[in-house]
Amino acid sequence: MKSNSMITKAACLMLMASATTSAFAQKMNIEHKGDTTIIKVENPTKYLLLPIQEEKDEAQVLLDTGSKDDTWMDVRLAQNGSDYYVPFALGKGKTATVKILGLKKDALALNLLKLSDTFDTTNTDYYRPSYHFTPLYGWMNDPNGMVYKDGEYHLYFQYNPYGSKWGNMHWGHAVSKDLVHWEHLEPAIARDPVGHIFSGSSVVDKKNTAGFGKNAIIAIYTNNSSVNHDEVQCIAYSNDNGRTFTKYEGNPVLTPFDGLKDFRDPKVFWYEKGKCWYMIVSADKET
């Protein structure tokens, strides 16, 4: 009887596990409305893996959460061949809705989409630098906002997480204790509806002069409009040692004046004698 009881309990547990798995199984539905492809994922995984074909034109991809901060990303989705995948975060919730503009209904990408909670970043490129810093995947350029705090060197950099060409400018992020060995972190500041997050600098506000908190890390960066490429200076602040940033609600803090163009790349530093912050911004002016 004891043996039969154990078998019965085991069978019940297996059925419960099966029911739980079934209840939370992922389901992806794709539909087309005009020039928009709508992908709905029930019980979404962490990522939707997007197949990339570098030679093709960019489509626009959006995670639609209904927020004013939802941002279209430019992605070279696979048309008739695939070079590699990039992860597209689906966020949390029972359903994730992804919208795509500029993708043909018969594009190969729609047959190659994958759902996954992980993304393999194993370095398989023989010629990839092992000493010089490179991101786990994607495109990088200028180092930005380099700062030292609490035993860590912070390296932020121009970063496109959706391909190996320029675009979708974010601030990527890595930290190191010795400037040689780097820990890769999630992008710190993402492209937003205003535009791309261009280069800038960071400071540790030891005296809380800005009011964001003592020892907050404050990033000062150029926001480049996705529409007309106007450039303005914005700030964001972090109270968790640079892992995440909150964009200042009063952005922009500085706009072009006196006919200035190419108004970007702010460098900020504290002038102790004057007890104030100074900002140096590169600019061009036609005369």
Short names for language-model regions:
Residues 26-265, 270-287:
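Beta-rich carbohydrate-recognition and catalytic domains
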Residues 1-27:
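Bacterial Sec-dependent N-terminal signal peptides
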